[in-house]
Design a protein with these regions (language model features):
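ATP-hydrolysis module of ASCE/P-loop NTPase motor domains
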Residues: 21, 77, 81-84, 102-137
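P-loop NTPase Walker
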Residues: 1-104
């Protein structure tokens, strides 16, 4: 599929968002409105107009959405999409902190895994309580 046919599948508002000049873009819309399709088209448009895929960072709320976006762009562009990065907001922030912890006042920090979280939770709450971690939502 060519970039023109991909853009041709979008409505007017989606096409405007997909073809914005090389600048940051925030796509906010309700469920089922075509956000993913628009973001895929935007990434494909940027790559097809000369932006290296490695210079594009796509943010998504879930890992599934981030993975789906990258897979769809690769499906449309093939090797040109190599290096495209999409991640969750959390993963992106963790990446930034790992790269420059001193900027965030986090030098020497450690991220703990779920087992360590449970052990800490038990110590704080008391071992006789439930072993279930609270829902993070």
């Amino acid at each position: 599929m060519t970039i023109d046919s991909l853009l041709g599948e979008l409505n007017a508002s989606q096409r405007v968002a997909a073809c914005l000049p090389r600048q940051h873009a925030l796509v906010l819309a309700g469920a089922g409105s075509g956000k993913t399709k628009t973001i895929v088209a935007r990434a494909a448009y940027l790559i097809s107009t000369g932006t290296p895929a490695t210079r594009i960072q796509i943010m998504a709320f879930t890992r599934r959405a981030a993975t789906e976006i990258v897979e769809r762009v690769k499906m449309h562009l093939g090797d040109a999409a190599r290096g495209l990065n999409a991640s969750t907001f959390h993963a992106w922030c963790m990446h930034l902190i790992h790269r420059a912890p001193q900027i965030f006042g986090c030098k020497g920090y450690t991220v703990i895994d779920e087992d360590d979280q449970l052990q800490l939770f038990k110590r704080v709450r008391g071992a006789r309580q439930s072993d279930e971690l609270p829902d993070s939502r």
